[in-house]
C-alpha cells in the first residue's frame, strides 16, 4: 500500500481528477517503497489547464506590480515555514540526503522567488525621443500562458526557477514535473494558491514527457516553453515548439564539464572542489565537473587526496541527517550509471575506487552506486565523452595550458567549467577561452539567484535566473506618439 494518497492534477486553484484512470508509481529509491500512485494527465486535461491558465493570467496581469510582488513574497514566507516538510518529501521522492534538501533545495528556490518578487515593480519600458513633436515609448508585456518542463534531480527548485520569473512578469505557467519525481511540485502549487496567486496561474500536470510534454510543446496557445533535461530530448522540444507555433524556448540541457587543476593550485582545495563537482547530490547535477584535468606530475598526489576524501563520504539512509550521499533517483537510472562504469573498465580506465552497486544490508533494497573514480582516462573514452549523471569522476592528465584548453573545449557540451589556481592572471586568461556558460574560479557549484545560468553549444538555449530571465518572459511593444501634424504622401 502506498504511503500517500492518490496524487491528482492541480488545475484552476485545486486538485482535479485526470481524464482517465491511468496512474504511475512514485518510488522511494532508497528502499523501493511505493510512495504514491500519481495520475497521468490526458490531452483533454492539457486543454483544461490552458483554458484555466488563460483566465487566471488575465486577472494576474491586471494586478498592479506591488500586488503581484506582495503575493509572491507571501509564497516565499510559506515555503520557508514549510522548509523541513518539503525537504523531507523531496528526500523520499528523489533519494537525495536530507542534509542536502533541508539546506539547499527549498531554500535556494525560495531565494529565487524572493529575488523576482522584488523585481516585479522594476519591469518598465523606455521613452525614446524622435523629434520635438514625437516620441516612442516601449512596454514590457507578459507573454501569456507559458509551459515549464522540469527534470528529476531538483524538482521543487527547478519549478521555482521557472515559475518565479514567469509569474513575476505577469504570465501563467503550466508545469510538468518529471515523471520520476512529481510530488513536491504539487505542494508548490498549493503554496502559490495559499499565498493568493489567482486560480489557473500555476497549474501542474503529471505524466510522461512523451505524452504531456509533447502536448504542451505543440499547443498553439502556449507562448513559451522552458525545459530542463537531456540534450536529445531538448532537441525534440525545440523542434516541436518551433514547428507548432514558433514558441520561444529556454533550455538548460546536458553537460560534460571540465575542471582544470593547475600546477600552482592548493591540492587540498582542488581535491575538495573536485569532490563537490562530482559527488554532491550523488553526482546527479547537470553542471558537474566530471572531467578533471590534472598536471601529469601531480597525478599521484592528487589521486591520493581524492581517494582519502572518497573514504570519508557518508553513504546511507538519506533520511538520516548524518548521511551526505544517498541512492540514485531510480533503479533504471542506477542501471544506466552501472553501464557506463562497465564501459570505463572495458575501455582501459584505471579504477581508483568504487565501481559497483552497493548491496550490503539495507543498501540492497535501494539504487545505491558506490562513489567511483577512474584515472588514466583518455579523451575518446565513453565515460569522458558522454554525460553519465552519476557519481563517476574521470581524471585526465595534461602537460601544457594550451593543450588543456583545447581538450577541455573538445566536447559537444558547454554548460559549465572551472579551474583551480593561485594565479589570477592565468585564471581569467583561461576562463575567457573556455566554451561554457557557467564558470567558476577556485570554487564550484554555487548558482545565486542573480547569476544567469545556461550553456553554450548543445547544453542549452537562453538563461535562467538573473534579470535576463525575467525579461525573457516578457515581450516588448513599441508605441510611437505623434503630437504634431501628420503629412501623407498621397
Curated annotation (Swiss-Prot):
Its EC number is 1.2.1.8. K(+) 1 binds at residues 27, 93, 180. K(+) 2 binds at residues 246, 457, 460. Binds 2 potassium ions per subunit. GO terms for molecular function: betaine-aldehyde dehydrogenase (NAD+) activity; metal ion binding. NAD(+) binds at residues 150-152, 176-179, 230-233, 254, 286, 387. It catalyses: betaine aldehyde + NAD(+) + H2O = glycine betaine + NADH + 2 H(+). Its cofactor is K(+). The modification Cysteine sulfenic acid (-SOH) is found at residue 286. Pathway: Amine and polyamine biosynthesis; betaine biosynthesis via choline pathway; betaine from betaine aldehyde: step 1/1. Keywords: Metal-binding, NAD, NADP, Oxidation, Oxidoreductase, Potassium. The keyword NAD applies. Signal peptide: none annotated. This is Betaine aldehyde dehydrogenase.
Amino acid at each position: 500500500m502506498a504511503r500517500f494518497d492518490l496524487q491528482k492534477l492541480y488545475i484552476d486553484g485545486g486538485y482535479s481528477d485526470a481524464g482517465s484512470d491511468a496512474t504511475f508509481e512514485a518510488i522511494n529509491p532508497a528502499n523501493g517503497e511505493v510512495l504514491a500512485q500519481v495520475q497521468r494527465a490526458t490531452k483533454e486535461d492539457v486543454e483544461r489547464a490552458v483554458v484555466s491558465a488563460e483566465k487566471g493570467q488575465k486577472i494576474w496581469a491586471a494586478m498592479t506590480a506591488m500586488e503581484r510582488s506582495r503575493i509572491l513574497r507571501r509564497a516565499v514566507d510559506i515555503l520557508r515555514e514549510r522548509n523541513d516538510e518539503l525537504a523531507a518529501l523531496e528526500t523520499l521522492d528523489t533519494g537525495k540526503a536530507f542534509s542536502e534538501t533541508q539546506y539547499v533545495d527549498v531554500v535556494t528556490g525560495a531565494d529565487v522567488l524572493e529575488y523576482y518578487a522584488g523585481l516585479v515593480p522594476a519591469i518598465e519600458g523606455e521613452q525614446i525621443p524622435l523629434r520635438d513633436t514625437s516620441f516612442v515609448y516601449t512596454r514590457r508585456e507578459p507573454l501569456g500562458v507559458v509551459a515549464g518542463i522540469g527534470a528529476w534531480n531538483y524538482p521543487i527548485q527547478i519549478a521555482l526557477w521557472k515559475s518565479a520569473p514567469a509569474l513575476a512578469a505577469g504570465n501563467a505557467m503550466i508545469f510538468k514535473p518529471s515523471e520520476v519525481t512529481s510530488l513536491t511540485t504539487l505542494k508548490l502549487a498549493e503554496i502559490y494558491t495559499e499565498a493568493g496567486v489567482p486560480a489557473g496561474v500555476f497549474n501542474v500536470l503529471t505524466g510522461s514527457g512523451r505524452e504531456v510534454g509533447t502536448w504542451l510543446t505543440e499547443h498553439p496557445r502556449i507562448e513559451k516553453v522552458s525545459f530542463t533535461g537531456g540534450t536529445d530530448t531538448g532537441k525534440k522540444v525545440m523542434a516541436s515548439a518551433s514547428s507548432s507555433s514558433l514558441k520561444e524556448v529556454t533550455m538548460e540541457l546536458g553537460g560534460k564539464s571540465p575542471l582544470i587543476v593547475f600546477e600552482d593550485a592548493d591540492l587540498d582545495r582542488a581535491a575538495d572542489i573536485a569532490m563537490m563537482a562530482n559527488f554532491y547530490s550523488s553526482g546527479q547535477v547537470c553542471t558537474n565537473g566530471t572531467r578533471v584535468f590534472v598536471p601529469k606530475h601531480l597525478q599521484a598526489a592528487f589521486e591520493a587526496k581524492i581517494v582519502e576524501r572518497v573514504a570519508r563520504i557518508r553513504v546511507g539512509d538519506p533520511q538520516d541527517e548524518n548521511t551526505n550521499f544517498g541512492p540514485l533517483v531510480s533503479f533504471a537510472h542506477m542501471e544506466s550509471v552501472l553501464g557506463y562504469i562497465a564501459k570505463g573498465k572495458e575501455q582501459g580506465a584505471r579504477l581508483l575506487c568504487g565501481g559497483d552497486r552497493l548491496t550490503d544490508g539495507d543498501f540492497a533494497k535501494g539504487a545505491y552506486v558506490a562513489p567511483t573514480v577512474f584515472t588514466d582516462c583518455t579523451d575518446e573514452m565513453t565515460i569522458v565523452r558522454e554525460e553519465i549523471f552519476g557519481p563517476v569522476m574521470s581524471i585526465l592528465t595534461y602537460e601544457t595550458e594550451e593543450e588543456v584548453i583545447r581538450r577541455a573545449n573538445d566536447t559537444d557540451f558547454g554548460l559549465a567549467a572551472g579551474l583551480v589556481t593561485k594565479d589570477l592572471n592565468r585564471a581569467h586568461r583561461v576562463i575567457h577561452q573556455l566554451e561554457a556558460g557557467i564558470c567558476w574560479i577556485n570554487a564550484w557549484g554555487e548558482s545565486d539567484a542573480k547569476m544567469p545560468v545556461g550553456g553554450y553549444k548543445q547544453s542549452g538555449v537562453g538563461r535562467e535566473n538573473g534579470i535576463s530571465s525575467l525579461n525573457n518572459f516578457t515581450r516588448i511593444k513599441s508605441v510611437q506618439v505623434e503630437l504634431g501634424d501628420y503629412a501623407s504622401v498621397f
